[in-house]
Every structure is written in C-alpha cells, then in structure tokens.
C-alpha cells in the first residue's frame, strides 16, 4: 500500500482520507516514516527555510483561545506590554539576519490590530528594510484587506494566520472568533499579493483523526507553509493539565502531514523544546523542512546556531530561496 501511495503522489495524485486513517493505525510506522522521507526529498529537495519572530505586543488579548497565555480571560503569568518601537524591532531583525535566518515576523497579541497600530508597525517594517535584507512577515490577527495592503506596501511579503486545529475541534477551544474569519483574512492577504503561512497546534486533546482532518483542511485552502506547534501546557490556561503526545504520535502526525501536503514547508514551531534531540532529528528526516528559531513568544524556543547545525547534520541546506506560491483561492 505504501509504495502505491508513494507512486501516486509522485505522479501528481493525492492521499485519500481512508488511506491516511489506515496509515495512522498501521503497526509498521517505520515504513510510513521512510515513505514520508522520500516524498519530502522528491518534492522539496534539501532546502530548509528559517524564520524568526518578535513578540511585538504581549498579553491582554480579548479572545478566549484555551491554549493561549496571552488571553486576558485566564490567569497565566506572562509579561504584558504594548507595541515595541521600530528601533527595537529593526535591531532584532538585523541580529537574526546576521545569524543566517531568512525571515522575520512581528507577532502581536489581540483579535486584530487597530489602524493606528498598523501604521506604527508599517514604520517598524520600513526601519527593518533599511537595516537588513531579511524577508518580512506579519502575524497580527484578523485583518482587513485595507490593513493588509498597508503592510504589503511597507515590505511585508508573508502573512501568518494559524487555523490552529481541525474544523470539527476548533469551536471547543475558542468561542470569540471562527475559522471562517481566519480564512477571510488569509484570502484578503492573498488578494494584496502576500504569501500565506498557516498551521496550528497539536496535542490539545484532539484525536489522530482530527489531526488528519486538519492536514486535509490546510491542503484544501492551498497552504504551503505549515507551522506545527506542540502544545506546551501553560499554568493558568484551561489546557494546563493536558497530557503530552507520545513521540510516536508526534512523528506519525508529521509523516501524515507530509503525505497530505507533499509540497509544503512543514515548520518546527512552539513547544519543540519538549522533544528529545533524537526525535527532532527523526522529525526532520521524516518531513520537517523549516523552523522558527530563536525565542518563541511565551514558550521556550531553540537558538539559531544550534538549529543551523542540526539542519546541516540532517543533510539539509539552510537557504533564503524558499518562496512558495503567492495566490490561489481569492
């Protein structure tokens, strides 16, 4: 079965839902991992994409996402502050570029950014572009096309908006906005000319079937940069007592995401520090070919130099030439 699926993918076909469910329950996980490895190398070669972020505005978010320490609905202990200055953002971007990182994103808490905040961040992006040639991304919540156009005009080429989890599971985790609102933001970003980055968090209590549903959903909306965060339960949030995924569950999820999205950059993201070095290497072997590196929001990230070495040891080349397609469904 694995060889049949692999041949079909190479010839332009797709994995079916029924096949994904069978692979998830198969006892021969190594065969699944090897197939995902070969598909990764066939479609994506040895390129590895890197990006970094700065938490440009922290805390006091009005949304009630159950996993998130930024929400003001919960009692998580995090630092809270307003927008960072353009000088601070530009300095961090230049520092990350010197470390060999290809992309840099401002990330801000909140449902959306006000027009005044958008103008302030446009100033930050202009300052970044004056300091360095790093590619600019943004993750600022649910934005209108008008606001996205301002960002695009000031150097932002990629917009990040995580769909977070399977459509069947999302309503149990967040009641203050919907995935349809996220999709509207993604489509607006594409209309102004931006690329899109959208993934989510695994290990929030969803089933393997829902992870597969999520992977197919991302495929259906043509996402080609997929951050795969691992829940790091944060004290004070509703998910603080959630049990961690097993290593096999995590690696199986990566393999299935690869077979369902063979042309995507699957990105190490938040919570990765929970994985052992051996599991991180195995994940890269199976299908991870991008990473957020540096300090990640309110969880512990991975330092750039260590990540660069890991990527090279796993047979990949860190490169800035990793653009994905710009426009699909408007």
Swiss-Prot record:
Which Gene Ontology BP terms does the record give?
A: biotin biosynthetic process
Q: Where is [2Fe-2S] cluster annotated to bind?
A: 105, 137, 197, 267
Name the reaction it catalyses.
(4R,5S)-dethiobiotin + (sulfur carrier)-SH + 2 reduced [2Fe-2S]-[ferredoxin] + 2 S-adenosyl-L-methionine = (sulfur carrier)-H + biotin + 2 5'-deoxyadenosine + 2 L-methionine + 2 oxidized [2Fe-2S]-[ferredoxin]
Residues annotated to bind [4Fe-4S] cluster: 61, 65, 68
Q: Domain Radical SAM core spans what residues?
A: 43-272
Q: Would I find Iron-sulfur among this entry's keywords? A: yes
Query: Its Enzyme Commission number?
Result: 2.8.1.6
Q: Which UniProt keywords apply?
A: 2Fe-2S, 4Fe-4S, Biotin biosynthesis, Iron, Iron-sulfur, Metal-binding, S-adenosyl-L-methionine, Transferase
Q: Which CDD domains match?
A: Radical_SAM
| Cofactor descriptive note | Binds 1 [4Fe-4S] cluster. The cluster is coordinated with 3 cysteines and an exchangeable S-adenosyl-L-methionine.
**Gene3D superfamilies on file:** Aldolase class I (3.20.20.70)
- According to its UniProt record, which cofactors does this protein need? [4Fe-4S] cluster; [2Fe-2S] cluster
Q: Name one GO molecular function term.
A: biotin synthase activity
* Protein's UniProt keywords contain Cytoplasm: no
Pathway per the UniProt entry: Cofactor biosynthesis; biotin biosynthesis; biotin from 7,8-diaminononanoate: step 2/2
Summarize the protein's role: Catalyzes the conversion of dethiobiotin (DTB) to biotin by the insertion of a sulfur atom into dethiobiotin via a radical-based mechanism.
Family statement drawn from the similarity comment of this UniProt entry:
Belongs to the radical SAM superfamily. Biotin synthase family.
Assembly information from the UniProt record: Homodimer.
Q: Record's HAMAP family?
A: BioB
Please report the name of this protein according to its UniProt entry: Biotin synthase
Lineage, broadest ranks: Bacteria, Pseudomonadati, Bacteroidota, Bacteroidia, Bacteroidales
């Amino acid at each position: 079965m694995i060889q049949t699926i692999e041949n079909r993918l190479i010839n332009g076909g797709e994995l079916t839902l029924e096949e994904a469910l069978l692979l998830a329950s198969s006892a021969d996980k190594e065969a699944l991992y090897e197939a995902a490895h070969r598909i990764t190398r066939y479609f994506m070669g040895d390129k590895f994409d890197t990006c970094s972020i700065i938490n440009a505005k922290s805390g006091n978010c009005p949304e009630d996402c159950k996993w998130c320490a930024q929400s003001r609905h919960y009692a998580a202990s995090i630092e809270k502050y307003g927008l960072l200055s353009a000088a601070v953002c530009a300095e961090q971007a230049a520092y990350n570029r010197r470390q060999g990182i290809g992309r840099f994103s401002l990330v801000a808490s909140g449902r959306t950014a006000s027009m005044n905040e958008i103008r302030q961040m446009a100033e930050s992006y202009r300052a970044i572009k004056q300091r360095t040639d790093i590619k600019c991304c943004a993750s600022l919540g649910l934005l209108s096309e008008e606001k996205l156009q301002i960002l695009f005009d000031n150097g932002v080429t990629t917009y990040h908006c995580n769909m977070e989890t399977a459509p069947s599971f999302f309503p149990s985790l967040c009641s203050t906005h919907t995935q349809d609102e996220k999709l509207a933001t993604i489509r607006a970003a594409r209309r102004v000319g931006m690329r899109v980055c959208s993934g989510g968090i695994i290990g929030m209590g969803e089933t393997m079937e829902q992870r597969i549903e999520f992977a197919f959903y991302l495929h259906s909306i043509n996402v080609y940069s997929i951050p795969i965060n691992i829940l790091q339960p944060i004290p004070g949030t509703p998910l603080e007592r959630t049990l961690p995924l097993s290593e096999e569950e995590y690696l199986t999820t990566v393999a299935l995401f690869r077979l369902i999205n063979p042309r995507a950059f699957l990105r190490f993201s938040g919570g990765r520090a929970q994985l052992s070095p051996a599991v991180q290497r195995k994940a890269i072997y199976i299908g991870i070919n991008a990473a957020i590196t540096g300090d990640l929001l309110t969880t512990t990230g991975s330092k750039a130099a260590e990540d660069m070495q890991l990527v090279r040891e796993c047979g990949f080349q860190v490169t800035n030439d990793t653009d994905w397609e710009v426009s699909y469904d408007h």
